[in-house]
Amino acid sequence: MIRFFALSLLLGSMASAASAADVVVEIRGVEARAGALQTSLQTRSEFMKEKGLRSVVEQPAPGVVRITFSNVPAGEYAFNALHDLDGNGRMTLSKSYIPSDGWAMVGGEKLQGAPTFDDVKFVVGSDNMTVRVKMTYFDGNIPSANPAR
């Protein structure tokens, strides 16, 4: 009987390990600026909300920042990063609704407007994976909107 329970526990832990993976997110292009880097791994129901399935806040070094989310259950997720330059804890927008803070999402460089979950989602399976994103900083200006630049 004890052997049965021990075997059940072992098989149960193997099954849960097989359905979860570590997700490493490489954030490229982080600039040397003040403010915390807020990152979040989110399900569809958590998308663009304050907290996700897993969240990490850190003071970033410039260059590439790596964030590891351990034992992520298989499924569809979005990742977003906010370099909170003004320290207010949320995305700051200019009068023309352009982000004043740095930000990154999977596929973010292709976005033409506000993202949807389907625009930026990726799939986590049972294998560990690395996702790469690039920080975007607008500084309140869009170069193509100002021909003098």
Identify the function of each model-found stretch:
Residues 23-29, 39, 133:
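A short, amphipathic beta-strand motif
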Residues 32-49:
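Short, ordered, surface-exposed loop/turn motifs in non-cytosolic proteins
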Residues 14-20:
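Sec/Tat signal peptide C-region and signal peptidase I cleavage site
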Residues 63, 68, 73-76:
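A glycine-anchored, Pro-Gly-centered beta-turn/N-cap motif
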Residues 4-14:
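Sec-dependent N-terminal signal peptides
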